[in-house]
């Protein structure tokens, strides 16, 4: 019996021209598109895709996850999304679940895929350009100056940054806005402030490049990536 397939599609960081050919072809072939939506209705990944793919006639599912620490609420939202996706897959409709950057890096797809597979459906990842690679290009920086140089990807929480700051090599702090003031303080304390740079909304029309954290305003985009050397 035929079944639909769930594709976790990496949309890249923001520039539609950074969508891979495979990502474009996969999205074109899927009648259903699931895309993250913020609380104020913005769908960044979908807007990126619209710059490269004609979505006319496709069903669009907004994916909403509240920024809550309530475990039960998060589990309920997760289960609701799985049910909605499975309903389409069971009707033999392939679904492209859009993920900013790459679907293996802090992505909704990797949290959803095991439950979809457990229900007997395929879930396949379509790689995308990771945001931190585009950030490195925007900064004109080498993330690994030596072949033996370590590279660390760190979520933007206070405790995560404090733990990682002493590690050797380059640290990439994703979603750096989550605790920016605390991160700045930690970097000053550890003597790493002058070696840190930040890019907001990389690849989007609103992109901002900050060579010094002194220039970064307290309020800014959630999509901020910091590079600490």
Protein language model features and the residues they cover:
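A contiguous loop/helix-start segment that scaffolds small-molecule binding in enzyme catalytic cores
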Residues: 6, 95, 165-229
């Amino acid at each position: 019996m035929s079944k639909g397939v769930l594709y976790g599609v990496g949309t890249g960081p923001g520039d539609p021209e950074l969508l891979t050919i495979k990502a474009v072809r996969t999205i074109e072939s899927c009648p259903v598109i699931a895309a993250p939506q913020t609380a104020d209705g913005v769908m960044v990944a979908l807007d990126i895709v619209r710059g490269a793919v004609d979505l006319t006639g496709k069903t669009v599912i907004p994916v909403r996850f509240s920024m809550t620490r309530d475990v039960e609420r998060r589990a309920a939202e997760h289960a609701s999304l799985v049910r909605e996706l499975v309903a389409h897959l069971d009707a033999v409709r392939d679904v492209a679940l859009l993920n900013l950057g790459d679907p293996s890096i802090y992505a909704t797809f990797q949290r959803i895929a095991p439950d979809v597979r457990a229900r007997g459906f395929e879930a396949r990842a379509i790689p995308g350009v990771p945001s931190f690679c585009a950030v490195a290009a925007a900064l004109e920086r080498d993330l690994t100056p030596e072949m033996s140089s370590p590279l660390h990807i760190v979520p933007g929480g206070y405790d995560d940054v404090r733990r990682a700051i002493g590690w050797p090599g380059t640290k990439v702090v994703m979603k750096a806005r989550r605790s920016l003031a605390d991160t700045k303080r930690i970097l000053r304390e550890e003597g790493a402030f002058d070696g840190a740079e930040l890019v907001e909304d990389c690849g989007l029309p609103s992109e901002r490049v900050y060579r010094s954290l002194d220039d970064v305003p307290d309020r800014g985009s959630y999509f901020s990536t910091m590079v600490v050397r």
